[in-house]
Amino acid sequence: MMNACTKFSDNYDVKEELGKGAFSVVRRCVHKTTGLEFAAKIINTKKLSARDFQKLEREARICRKLQHPNIVRLHDSIQEESFHYLVFDLVTGGELFEDIVAREFYSEADASHCIQQILESIAYCHSNGVVHRDLKPENLLLASKAKGAAVKLADFGLAIEVNDSEAWHGFAGTPGYLSPEVLKKDPYSKPVDIWACGVILYILLVGYPPFWDEDQHRLYAQIKAGAYDYPSPEWDTVTPEAKSLIDSMLTVNPKKRITADQALKVPWICNRERVASAIHRQDTVDCLKKFNARRKLKAAISAVKMVTRMSGVLRTSDSTGSVASNGSTTHDTSQIAGTSSQPTSPAAEGAILTTMIATRNLSNLGRNLLNKKEQGPPSTIKESSESSQTIDDNDSEKAQKQDIVRVTQTLLDAISCKDFDTYTRLCDTSMTCFEPEALGNLIEGIEFHRFYFDGNRKNQVHTTMLNPNVHIIGEDAACVAYVKLTQFLDRNGEAHTRQSQESRVWSKKQGRWLCVHVHRSTQPSTNTTVSEF
């Protein structure tokens, strides 16, 4: 399947564009020999960072081994000098959720059939050591527009490979579908996909999600607590068996959560003709229409924001005669409106045009949504303003860096305040250090520092961390380097400031960041009223 030498153009004719991402475009293509149609994801590898390239290789590796009727299949993977081509099934049926609202009849039994196909794909993934991590409506497609077309799971860009003896720590997924263990930054594995299935099944039955809040922090608090319910009247007509399955999927403790294989054996799924209700659910269809409209509106807003940022960097690079290394572009509103007198590069013009098209689509979606609101949407519609935006490991890395800066500042504050209890909670008992007070010796453990906490408690000391630079070293380790300013009063009450360069290595153990090494470069002070250690 992997072809590293044959040119893509030698085997495929490229047709119209089907979609576009930050560093890739999806086009319909036709195999020259067989005449079969496919969807080619074309990635510009010149614009990828080393981390992004690793993700691409991981996605291709995972997709190559997944061969299932309910998964969008990868048929070919071709690496060329500047581009990588992933050739997938061409699925023409659109999103599952969009198809449901166009149906004349939709029942609980239909929802059972939908979730069964999703669970079949997830069970297959899990049996092959793959966790999808981004189950959501946008990634549930239909093979064709034919009645009864198979549901296809798509987009394995965030998928990971795991085994039964290991867990993952990366923060990835889409907010409304994230599991409690991911939000708590606990180790996680296959059960995260089952939680997302529970959210999807809830939506399939009533047309709105189980967790909702306009404030993302409150949304996350709901999810971590598993705080959802079955309000009347829409849930009164749902069978107890369906609610029981949702409860088993939305179990906060991942160890007690039902597995995909177990869920497939539940009578509501494997014997739906006898257990699931066959009554048409018009209210669900109506709510789902509004749910879809909100998803599309938010996607358009995200597209406008992304393209605006991207086109501005391109504008900047064009005016300076250089190209941004990450390939992103951004520009201001006046340039979009055409009020700038500066000449525009062809690439910038394309970015501006894309922004204008996205803005037009956004306006149309906004009008449609307003029209739907005027028709009187039910008060039970629930959707978070953030719930459709996918979070990947890059977002996780930003959050991880912020955590490192925060915990480092807390440690410095503990030193300034002579708070040895907090200091010991933040430092590993075997922490090593190089510092002037040790006269060039490598010190192990924290007892050496106790002396500085026990003495001079009345000194006023304030520490400021400047320009922290965090390097992430895997999932459980990080290094931070910074300039430290220490302000203090001497015995005569005169203020002094001392500057030093410091670096700390942090390791996450049992869910907590602990400092395992510190190195500080400065001359020991002749003034003994304060130590910086």
UniProtKB/Swiss-Prot annotation:
Belongs to the protein kinase superfamily. CAMK Ser/Thr protein kinase family. CaMK subfamily. It holds the Pfam family CaMKII_AD. Role in locomotion and neuronal cell fate specification. Required for the regulation of synaptic density, egg laying, defecation, and meiotic maturation. Required for viability under chronic osmotic stress in which it acts downstream of osr-1. Regulates the synaptic trafficking of glr-1. Bidirectional modulator of neurotransmitter release with negative modulatory effects mainly mediated via slo-1 activation. May suppress the functional response to an internal pacemaker, perhaps by modulating the activity of the IP3 receptor. Keywords: ATP-binding, Calmodulin-binding, Cell projection, Cytoplasm, Kinase, Magnesium, Metal-binding, Nucleotide-binding, Phosphoprotein, Serine/threonine-protein kinase, Stress response, Transferase. It catalyses: L-seryl-[protein] + ATP = O-phospho-L-seryl-[protein] + ADP + H(+); L-threonyl-[protein] + ATP = O-phospho-L-threonyl-[protein] + ADP + H(+). GO terms for molecular function: ATP binding; calcium/calmodulin-dependent protein kinase activity; calmodulin binding; metal ion binding; protein serine kinase activity. The keyword Cytoplasm applies. PROSITE patterns: PROTEIN_KINASE_ATP, PROTEIN_KINASE_DOM, PROTEIN_KINASE_ST. This is Calcium/calmodulin-dependent protein kinase type II. It comes from the Eukaryota.
